From Swiss-Prot:
GO terms for cellular component: plasma membrane. SUPFAM superfamilies: MFS general substrate transporter. Disulfide bonds: none annotated. It is a multi-pass membrane protein. Efflux pump; part of the gene cluster that mediates the biosynthesis of the mycotoxin fusarin C. Within the cluster, FUS1, FUS2, FUS8 and FUS9 are sufficient for fusarin production. The other FUS cluster members are not essential for fusarin C biosynthesis. This is Efflux pump FUS6.
Length: 563
């Protein structure tokens, strides 16, 4: 960020994005050997990212056990949504605060909040304590996701960020897929409380490592009053209110209330209007430091890539939430087995992302990975429409491999060009916007296919001869009953079982067809991304700094001064 004494002038002038220069003969940067301290920090960041990603879905397979133990069957959805809501709403707030209070402070605070929330969840004796703990966890998790990306961006040049983003993305992908397996294993073999307690020692080790080694620059930020005046309070309130209202609507739609009911439509409309008001407020001339400055969307490359990131995240959650419906309702897999059957995505997206990142670092070219990723995801989503009860293991594994490679390459290749199209002073806000939009996309990546699926099931349900079973599946019931137990309970009546499975297949086919449309939209948007030069010099006021033994001078290789 600009120096504080120049902040007002810089913001009033609304700094222009970096020129979108065409990439011609972009030489390979000289290799920069990283210190042991750099790698200790990076490993600690990767560990905390793993924990934050783990807790987005680790309770999915253990939720029945948790709700039965706490007696919270009617409020089970809040155990999931409290984390999602809190993490999404606080991401841009952490990004803005990082410019005011420094990266190190906000990173440590995020890990501490997450650890506190984990302890509260593990020790919960009632639903209120569990939901509250999950909300605290979500605040910390959102902070961890934001700060991990920002800190990495401050430690390496834009040219190198693809490689490190690929590693972080790989960690995220692995955590998201193994989480349901871990959750089920803890709930069945030890105790569901260890789903949360396991975070404490790992977070503790990361906290110590970050506290000892994460020494970053922090420009003077003035008095406490001056710091508080820089916070975008109005924008924060609008954003939190908007996200809360939208998450409520999407959580209720198709489950507790019909999508056409006022209980769903009213909060959704209010949330979307509040989101529009938030962006309008971000352009207010009196606003000193917006939470999400409109200049982030001021050039074709950054604005297009933010939309692409939204679509990519939407598709990732789309597939990871609805392939298990196929595995459990059609293949009759258990929840834990279903989670294992998703491993091909994690096992391919992680190495594909790292490979794409390394290639971007060496060549400076990233557009090819956007096209490659969306082509592979389009092929995969098209092939998913062919899955049926007789599909072999090779089919659903092979289709997932295509999707995994595609999603891994797109994840790694979006943030570096966004940052390349903007000034270095916008690293924190741009990274926060990118992370927020990805999280926001994940919310819609569950809601849209759920609405499509439920609508198609309602159309196909008349084919079911048993009126009782039919009533269980319509109006959102099909997703709830997409379980091994329910399908096996129909085995005494093979004809009825076949009818039910066929209804599920018809619903899923339309889900995959609509996902293909989003894949094609993402592919088309790739043409609007320009080839920019990825800067190979590190120019930041918050960078990492190595101390030389017996010297007050600091090495200029990795940053500025200590925070």
């Amino acid at each position: 960020m600009p120096q504080p004494d120049k902040m007002a002038a810089v913001n009033n002038a609304m700094p222009q994005p970096a020129p979108e220069k065409s990439l011609s003969s972009d030489p390979q940067p000289e290799s920069s050997k990283k210190s042991a301290r750099f790698w200790l920090i990076f490993v600690a960041i990767a560990l905390t990212t793993f924990l934050a990603a783990l807790d987005t879905s680790i309770i999915s397979t253990a939720l029945p056990t948790i709700t039965a133990d706490l007696g919270s069957e009617s409020l089970y959805v809040w155990i999931i949504d409290a984390y999602l809501l809190a993490s999404t709403a606080t991401i841009p707030i952490f990004a803005q605060a990082a410019n005011i209070y420094g990266r190190r402070s906000l990173t440590l605070i995020a890990v501490c909040i997450f650890t506190l929330g984990s302890g509260l969840c593990g020790g919960a004796h009632n639903t209120a304590m569990m939901v509250g703990g999950r909300a605290v966890q979500g605040i910390g998790g959102g902070g961890i996701l934001t700060m991990s990306e920002i800190v990495v961006c401050d430690m390496v040049s834009i040219r190198e960020r693809g490689m490190y983003a690929g590693i972080i993305g790989g960690v995220w992908a692995i955590a998201a897929v193994v989480a349901p397996v871990m959750g089920g294993a803890f709930a069945q073999n030890i105790s569901w409380r260890w789903i949360f307690y396991i975070n404490l020692p790992i977070a503790g080790v990361s906290l110590v490592a970050l506290g000892l080694f994460l020494k970053l620059a922090r420009p003077p930020s003035g008095t406490v009053k001056e710091q508080m005046s820089r916070i975008d309070w109005g924008g924060s309130v609008l954003l939190i209110g908007s996200v809360t209202s939208i998450v409520l609507a999407l959580s209720w739609g198709g489950s507790e209330h019909p999508w056409s009911g006022w209980q769903t439509i009213v909060p959704l409309v209010i949330g979307l209007l509040a989101l529009v008001a938030f962006f309008a407020y971000q352009g207010a001339p009196w606003l000193r430091e917006p939470t999400m400055p409109l200049r982030l969307f001021g050039n074709r490359t950054s604005s297009t890539l933010l939309v692409i990131s939204f679509i990519h995240s939407l598709l990732l959650y789309w597939v990871c939430y609805f392939l298990p419906v196929y595995f459990q309702a059609v293949k009759e897999a258990s929840p834990t087995r279903s989670a294992v059957m998703l491993f091909p995505i994690a096992c391919t997206s992680a190495p594909a992302g790292v490979a794409a990142g390394i290639t971007i670092t060496k060549t400076g070219k990233y557009r090819v990975w956007h096209f490659t990723g969306f082509v592979l995801m389009s092929i995969a989503c098209g092939l998913f429409t062919l899955l049926d009860a007789q599909s072999s293991t090779g089919r659903w594994v092979g289709f997932q491999i295509l999707f995994g490679v595609g999603t891994g390459t797109v994840f790694t290749s979006t943030l570096p060009p966004i940052l390349a199209s903007l000034p270095d002073s916008d690293v924190a806000t741009a990274t926060g916007a990118w992370t927020f939009i990805r999280n926001f996309g994940s919310i819609w990546g569950v809601a849209i296919p759920a609405a499509v699926f439920n609508n198609q099931v309602n159309h196909a349900a008349p084919k079911i001869s048993d009126s009782t079973v039919k009533s269980l599946l319509v109006d959102g019931g099909a997703y709830e009953h997409a379980t091994q137990h329910f399908i096996k309970s129909l085995s005494p009546n093979p004809e009825l079982k076949t009818q039910v499975i066929q209804v599920y297949l018809e619903g899923l086919k339309v889900v995959w067809q609509v996902s293909l449309a989003f894949c094609l939209l993402g592919f088309i948007l790739c043409f609007f991304v320009r080839s920019l030069t990825l800067r190979d010099e590190l120019n930041t006021e918050f960078g990492l700094k190595e101390e030389k033994p017996n010297s007050k001078n600091m090495s200029s290789e990795e940053g500025v001064v200590r925070e």
